[in-house]
Amino acid sequence: MEQHHQYLAHPHSSEEIRTEDYIAGLAKGLALLEAFGIDRQRLNVTQVAERTGISRTAARRYLKTLKFLGYLDTDEHYFWLTHRVLRFSSSYLSSAHLPKVAQSFLNLLCAQTSLTFSIVVLDEHEVVPVARSYLPQQDNLRVSPYGMHLGNRLPAHATSTGKVLLSVLDREVQIEWIEKYGLKRLTPYTITDEHTFLETLDAVRQSDYCLSTEEHELGLIAIAVPVLNAQGLTIAALNCMSQTNRVQPQYLIDQVLPLLRNTANELRNLV
C-alpha cells in the first residue's frame, strides 16, 4: 500500500522535511538561541517569547534547560549566551571548505594593499563573514571596519556583499525578499526605495561587482565581487572594506577590483 507523507516547507528556503521527521522542540530551542544578537544581548522570558513566538511558560522551560546545559547564563531575570555556543562556530570554521581555502588568499590581498578583506555568505536577510584577512604585523596598527569579525551579521540590503549575493537571484525572489525583510534606512545613503534597489541589483549583476559607500555605517566604503564554484553557482562574495577617509572609490575600482576578480577566479577552481 502506497504511503502518502505530509511535508513541512522551510520558511526561508526551498527545503522540505517530512512532518514525522521534524522535531519541533529542537527547532524551538535553536530559534531561542538565535533570538540573542548584537541588538539584544540579554533577554528576559517575555522578550524571548515575543521574539520566538512561543508561550512564556515554554520560553522559561527552554531558557532553564539551556542554562542547565551551559549555553546560557542568568542573573535570574535576564539570560545571555555563554562561550559554550562558540563550539558550533569553531566546528564550522575548522571543517568548512571555503573558509580554509580562502584564508591564504585573503591574507595575500591584505599584504598587497594593507586593507581588510573577507569572504561573506547570505543568511536570510543578513550577510555573515566566514573568513577574514589576518596579518598580525598589520592588524596591530590597522583599525578594522566595524562588523568584519567572523560570524557577525550585517543587513544584506545595505552592504556590497549583500547586493552582490541578492543580484543573482531571480526577480520574483528579489521582490519577495524585499517584501519580507524590507529596506530599513541605516544611514542617509541607504537605498530604501524598492524600484531603486532593484535597479541597483540589475546594475550589480551586469557589472559583476558592487561598490557601496556609507550605506550601512557612515565613514565606511566597500567593494565586492561574487565567488562562484566550479558549476558556475554563486556561493559567496569576496569584499574589501575600508574607511572613506583612507581610500577613494576610484582607487577601489581601479586597483582593488582587479585583485578581487583574480582571486575569485582562483577560488572557483578550488571550491
Swiss-Prot record:
**Keyword Transmembrane in annotation:** no
- What SUPFAM superfamilies does this protein's entry cite? GAF domain-like, Winged helix' DNA-binding domain
Q: Which residues bind DNA?
A: 45-64
Look up the record and give one Gene Ontology term from the biological process aspect: positive regulation of DNA-templated transcription
Does the keyword field hold Transcription?
A: yes
Domain HTH iclR-type, residue spans: 23-83
GO MF, one term, reads: DNA-binding transcription factor activity
Q: Pfam families, from UniProt?
A: HTH_IclR (PF09339), IclR_C (PF01614)
- Record's superkingdom? Bacteria
Which residue range or ranges hold the IclR-ED domain? 98-271
Give the record's keywords alphabetically.
Activator, Aromatic hydrocarbons catabolism, DNA-binding, Transcription, Transcription regulation
Entry's induction text: By p-hydroxybenzoate.
What is known about what this protein does?
Positive regulator of the pobA gene for p-hydroxybenzoate hydroxylase.
This one is known as p-hydroxybenzoate hydroxylase transcriptional activator
Instruction: Give the species.
Output: Acinetobacter baylyi (strain ATCC 33305 / BD413 / ADP1)
Q: What is the lineage of its organism?
A: Bacteria, Pseudomonadati, Pseudomonadota, Gammaproteobacteria, Moraxellales
The encoding gene is: pobR
